[in-house]
């Protein structure tokens, strides 16, 4: 095996056949020390007790798979021991070659450090990449004697020359793997080694994935949410641990003299070997010198990095410490083949040059030109070290990677090359995200260029404020340096949220300007928080800070909550806040009340087109246009115009939007609308694939449908046109039913069997994903004032906003959401943190309402009169999993209602506090139920508030001072922003445990990292690989792939939305409903039968259940899992609602 420690230097050369002979178990010599692998019984590393260096060997040289959660195998015979001083105590250490179980004989070798403190005989466990933690015994330290005695080597250098590496990440990396050094790939250099390698594992020639897969069995991986799980892994806690604290600073370091071309293996600068053959065997000399290159000094026994010496603080490079093409090429030649074995070796030179340059440049200012710093190279080295611990074959860092362009190309090569492997590794998913953030860093511009950019177009007032606080902003930027956060073990740093989060920033949210520059994440949140601070009123500052604070204090208040993803603005707000493009509203509800074709076309080309031009999502009520003649469809030509208009706007837009047409089920064209999408469209002139449809269902339809389902014969439904329907759409409840039945009694309309229309609805939903279903009477019944005679006639694009709209006024809503996963700490939900997040979100959205521009006068009136906001949630399912709960559990049912109540209570209290501080109530407050002291939840018989005292105090204050806003809680999908937060969307369960989408740019993968970590805690070795193979075959459904698990097993919690009973999901929405004064975008997830059919009764049953539970939204999307295992159908994927989906 290549790069094996020179064991033969002490034991004498043996033939390959001798090394392969099985040996009897041995015991430690009396008075000596022995080291054993805790995971394997009967395998022991033995030491002799001669004078001089201790000799160690494995009692069984065959490959031995360690137990659960261990991915390493032991392969060796005798290794040289060394004496070294560790934290003032004499210690014995040895270095034993180990090999990855899947890599086998491909020559991939790492080095494990074995050691203990001085004292009587004891045991010390072999460190592996699983735990890296040791039981420390007290072996007797042999004294060096005679002329061949080896003096103690100097303390090890930092692993690559960066001073910060003395402070390694405590959540993952060297400190968790202190027993294992980084590995490299090298070919065999002798026949015996070739034979040994070839016999070690028969899977040598496997692909990258299979060759690396066993590392996924490594124990507890880096947990980005370390506070989410209090369970410990299988690693052994040391009896005695001697670690250097962060505050101690780096230990004194004596770096070895670097090897220069022409140096002999025995050169004192390298540390001459002491065993036989060391002067003639270069590999033996190099390996014997590995003791001088252990990892960071804070560990008790640190890993050996490489046989190639690292370069010290006085490296003696043949060129100056200045980054130029000539110098970089010279260093590459100087390092020679070592760069192939150690891909990050060039980074050491880059780092030292950057450190020297930092001494010459002045402190960073707004005008400072962006440059790659020591911390940038440190971030790359951190990522490479983590990837090497996964035994990945890394390309060497190119000599020109000190330039932003080539560093970006190298990071891209790594991301594209290893992206497919994230499906099985949460750690790799996180590390590739770090590389994408580094790629973003290479395109960063100075603050001055960013502020002056015409493409960014910053608000003038914001620019002035930023200039006034230049020094503080530069300090904050340095404090949030990603590398500093990593090495100081700051949990949940933004750059570690995963690959999908980083890509979403890079591809969608960060502005591009100046040809090739990109807004940095820090600049984006500075833009948003700075603008919010500029527009915050005196009352808002008192609410947020408890006093009349400064701009800088308000900036920090918003910035930290945004940067930490406690609150998330809507997509238009994230893109436009802080710029002079003041359009931040998300949802628009338009009801032109047009009754003719010409009036409808004017509304579409006027109001609707203006909103689409600002990328707003539209809900368009078309009920009034209903003049079909026999055999014709009056509405379809107008809808074709709308479809083309949406397609034209989206073609040139970086943020596609959409429109949804609302009709009541008695509209004369309803059957034509149900056939306008996909394969149901009979002819191209009737096809409208770029828009959605929604049915505004009265209770009467479901009352009659239930009668049919109960067995009643000849239950009918009537369709009316404009001339016969009169003002039917203006009424709801009993008044609607009386008028509808009166029209039927008079013989008006077309009568059809009700089951025919129900089947057409279900067929369209299962085939195209729509129509969406909303319940007209529930919406109007729970609105803040009586709408009888002017009933609310539609909702927005995503069915979660409830607003009146008319020819004169359009409904407008501004959105934001709170990240519930950030409220979980040590498996406990922090309701204080939730209240704080909701308060900040309410203040943010009120600033948006005050500052936003509107595309039409109707929208301006709707925005100003009602000041409606929609505070949503994201990460509910993620929070549930982090707490160790299942959505089916009684504990979660209670938590679900508790969260909704706290959100509404905190939002209304904040809105009321604004009025207490001098803000005026919304215009229609006096006609609302709030004026009389009534709350939304009081109209629900199942509501049982737990904060009755707070509600009563709010009631009194609300009646006295009013409310700044008319509506508060709207549970939207949060499809886009949940990706940058790396949590589940909205309130829905995870769609799948491995999201995969193939586009022309490649495959996008987003694994459920919580599931991967639970799998690693449960299985080990081949069992883990088998479990993942089974999950792959079953679309990552744990219930289908692992049916033998005990019902109480932790893995049973990881169900997908398709695995849950849909009636349970409807019940969860109903439990929240009293505290959701808008509505909820509830998607239904159904699975085809084994024969590929989906009974219509399945969807009918679910819609009837949603109606009976009193919901406002009966179905947003209908997503169908195919029985053929070919994926999930969810309607037209080309239309993405990023406006209200955040």
Swiss-Prot record:
Q: Where is the protein localized?
A: Host cell membrane; Host endosome membrane
Looking at the record, which segments are called alpha-crystallin domain?
A: 294-400
Identify the residue span(s) of motif RIP homotypic interaction motif (RHIM): 55-75
Q: Where is the composition biased (Pro residues)?
A: 141-159
Q: Write down the position(s) of the site called Interacts with thioredoxin/glutaredoxin.
A: 1137, 1140
Spell out the Low complexity composition-biased ranges. 277-303
Q: Give any single GO term for biological process.
A: negative regulation of tumor necrosis factor-mediated signaling pathway
Active-site residues are 796, 798, 800
Check the record and name the InterPro entries matching this protein: HSV_RIR1, NrdE_NrdA_C, RNR_lg_C, RNR_lsu_N, Rrm1
Chain residues that bind substrate: 571, 586-587, 617, 796-800, 973-977
Q: What is known of its domains?
A: Contains an alpha-crystallin domain homologous to small heat-shock proteins.
Q: So what does this one do?
A: Ribonucleoside-diphosphate reductase holoenzyme that provides the precursors necessary for viral DNA synthesis. Allows virus growth in non-dividing cells, as well as reactivation from latency in infected hosts. Catalyzes the biosynthesis of deoxyribonucleotides from the corresponding ribonucleotides. The N-terminal region confers antiapoptotic activity in differentiated cells such as neurons and is important for viral reactivation to increase neural survivability. Prevents host necroptosis by targeting host RIPK1 and RIPK3, thereby hampering the formation of necroptotic RIPK1-RIPK3 complexes.
What name has this protein been given in UniProt? Answer: Ribonucleoside-diphosphate reductase large subunit
Name the species this protein comes from.
Human herpesvirus 2 (strain HG52) (HHV-2)
Name the gene that codes for it. RIR1
């Amino acid at each position: 095996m290549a790069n094996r420690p020179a064991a033969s230097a002490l034991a004498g050369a043996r033939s390959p056949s001798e090394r392969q002979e099985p040996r009897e178990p041995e015991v430690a010599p009396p008075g000596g020390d022995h080291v054993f692998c805790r995971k394997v019984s009967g395998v022991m590393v033995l030491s002799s007790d001669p004078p001089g260096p201790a000799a160690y060997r494995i009692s069984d040289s065959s490959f031995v798979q360690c137990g659960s959660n261990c991915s390493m195998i032991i392969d060796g015979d005798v290794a040289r021991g060394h004496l070294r001083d560790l934290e003032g105590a004499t210690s014995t250490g040895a270095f034993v070659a180990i090999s990855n179980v899947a890599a086998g004989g491909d020559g991939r070798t790492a080095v494990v450090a074995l050691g203990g403190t001085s004292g009587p005989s004891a045991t010390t466990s072999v460190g592996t990449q699983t735990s890296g933690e040791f039981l420390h015994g007290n072996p007797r330290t042999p004294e060096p004697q005679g002329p061949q005695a080896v003096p103690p080597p100097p303390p090890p250098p930092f692993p690559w020359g960066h001073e910060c590496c003395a402070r390694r990440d405590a959540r993952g990396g060297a400190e968790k793997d202190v027993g294992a050094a980084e590995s490299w790939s090298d070919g065999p250099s002798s026949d015996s080694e070739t034979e040994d390698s070839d016999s070690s594992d028969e899977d040598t020639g496997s692909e990258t994935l299979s060759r690396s897969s066993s590392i996924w069995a490594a124990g507890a991986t880096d947990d980005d949410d370390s506070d989410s799980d209090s369970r410990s892994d299988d690693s052994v806690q040391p009896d005695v641990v001697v670690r250097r604290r962060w505050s101690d600073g780096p230990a004194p370091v004596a770096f070895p003299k670097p090897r220069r071309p022409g140096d002999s293996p025995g050169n004192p600068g390298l540390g001459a070997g002491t065993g036989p053959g060391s002067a003639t065997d270069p590999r033996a000399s190099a390996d014997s010198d590995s003791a001088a290159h252990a990892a960071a000094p804070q560990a008790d026994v640190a890993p050996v990095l490489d046989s190639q010496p690292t370069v010290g603080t006085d490296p003696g490079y043949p060129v100056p410490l200045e980054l130029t093409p000539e110098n970089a090429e010279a260093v590459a030649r100087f390092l020679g083949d070592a760069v192939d074995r150690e891909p990050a070796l060039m980074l050491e030179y880059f780092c030292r040059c950057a450190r020297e340059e930092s001494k010459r440049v002045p402190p960073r200012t707004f005008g400072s030109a962006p440059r790659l710093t020591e911390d940038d190279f440190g971030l790359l080295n951190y990522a490479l070290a983590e990837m090497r611990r996964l035994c990945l074959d890394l390309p060497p860092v190119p000599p020109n990677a000190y330039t932003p362009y080539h560093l970006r190309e190298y990071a891209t090569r790594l991301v594209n090359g290893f992206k497919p492997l994230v499906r099985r590794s949460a750690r790799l998913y996180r590390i590739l995200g770090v590389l994408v953030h580094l790629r973003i860093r290479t395109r960063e511009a100075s603050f001055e260029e960013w502020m002056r950019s015409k493409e960014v177009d910053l608000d003038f007032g914001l620019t002035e404020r930023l200039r006034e606080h230049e020094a503080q902003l530069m300090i904050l930027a340095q404090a949030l340096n990603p590398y500093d956060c990593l090495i100081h073990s700051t949990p949940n740093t933004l750059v570690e949220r995963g690959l999908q989060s980083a890509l979403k920033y890079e591809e969608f949210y960060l502005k591009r300007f100046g040809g090739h520059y990109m807004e940095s994440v820090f600049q984006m949140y500075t833009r948003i928080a700075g603008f919010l601070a500029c527009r915050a009123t005196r009352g808002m500052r008192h609410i947020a800070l408890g006093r009349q604070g400064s701009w800088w204090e308000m900036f920090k208040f918003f910035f930290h909550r945004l940067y930490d993803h406690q609150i998330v603005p809507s997509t238009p707000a994230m893109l436009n806040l802080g710029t002079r493009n003041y359009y931040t509203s998300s949802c628009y509800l338009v009801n032109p009340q047009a009754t003719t074709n010409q009036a409808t076309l004017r509304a579409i080309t006027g109001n609707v087109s203006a909103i689409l031009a600002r990328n707003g999502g539209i809900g368009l009520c078309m009920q009034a246009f209903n003049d079909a003649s026999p055999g014709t469809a009056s509405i379809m030509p107008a809808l074709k115009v709308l479809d083309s208009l949406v397609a034209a706007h989206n073609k040139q837009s970086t943020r596609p939007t959409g429109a949804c047409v609302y009709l009541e089920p008695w509209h004369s064209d309803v059957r034509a609308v149900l056939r306008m999408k996909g394969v149901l469209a009979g002819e191209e002139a009737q096809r409208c694939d770029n828009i959605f449809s929604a049915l505004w269902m009265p209770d009467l339809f479901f009352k009659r449908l239930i009668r049919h389902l109960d067995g009643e014969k000849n239950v009918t439904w009537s369709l009316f046109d404009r001339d016969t329907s009169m003002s039917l759409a203006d009424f709801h409840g009993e008044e609607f039913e009386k008028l509808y039945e009166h029209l039927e009694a008079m013989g008006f309309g077309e009568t059809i069997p009700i089951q025919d229309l129900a089947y057409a609805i279900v067929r369209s939903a299962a085939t195209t994903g729509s129509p969406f279903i909303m319940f007209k009477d529930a919406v109007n019944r729970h609105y803040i004032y009586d709408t009888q005679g002017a009933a609310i006639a539609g909702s927005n694009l995503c069915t979660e906003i409830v607003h009146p709209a008319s020819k004169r006024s359009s409904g407008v809503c501004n959105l934001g959401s709170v990240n519930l996963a950030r409220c979980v700490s040590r498996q406990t939900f922090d309701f204080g943190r939730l209240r704080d997040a909701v308060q900040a979100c309410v203040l943010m959205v009120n600033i948006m309402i005050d500052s936003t521009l509107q595309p039409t006068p109707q929208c301006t009136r709707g925005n100003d009169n009602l000041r409606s906001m929609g505070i949503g949630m994201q990460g509910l399912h993620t929070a549930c999993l982090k707490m160790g709960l299942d959505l089916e559990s009684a504990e979660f049912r209670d938590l679900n209602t508790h969260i909704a109540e706290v959100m509404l209570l905190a939002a209304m209290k904040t809105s009321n506090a604004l009025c207490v501080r001098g803000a005026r109530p919304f215009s229609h407050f006096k006609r609302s139920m709030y004026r009389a002291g009534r709350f939304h939840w009081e109209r629900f018989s199942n509501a049982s508030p737990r904060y009755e005292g707070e509600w009563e105090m709010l009631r009194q204050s609300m009646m006295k001072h009013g409310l700044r806003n008319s509506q508060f809680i709207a549970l939207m999908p949060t499809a886009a922003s949940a990706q940058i937060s790396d949590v589940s969307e909205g309130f829905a369960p995870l769609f799948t445990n491995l999201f995969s989408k193939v586009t022309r740019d490649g495959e996008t993968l987003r694994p459920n990292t919580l599931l991967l970590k639970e799998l690693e805690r449960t299985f080990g070795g081949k069992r883990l690989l088998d479990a993942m193979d089974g999950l792959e075959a079953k679309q990552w459904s744990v219930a289908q792939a692992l049916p033998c698990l005990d019902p109480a097993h932790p893995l049973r919690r990881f169900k997908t939305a398709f695995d849950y009973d849909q009636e349970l999901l409807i019940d969860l929405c109903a439990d929240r409903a009293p505290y959701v004064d808008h509505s909820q975008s509830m998607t239904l997830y159904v699975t085809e039968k084994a024969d590929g059919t989906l009974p219509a009764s399945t969807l009918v049953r679910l819609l009837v259940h949603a109606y009976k539970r009193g919901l406002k939204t009966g179905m947003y999307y209908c997503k169908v899992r195919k029985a053929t295992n070919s994926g999930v159908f969810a309607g037209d994927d080309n239309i993405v609602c990023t406006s209200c989906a955040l």
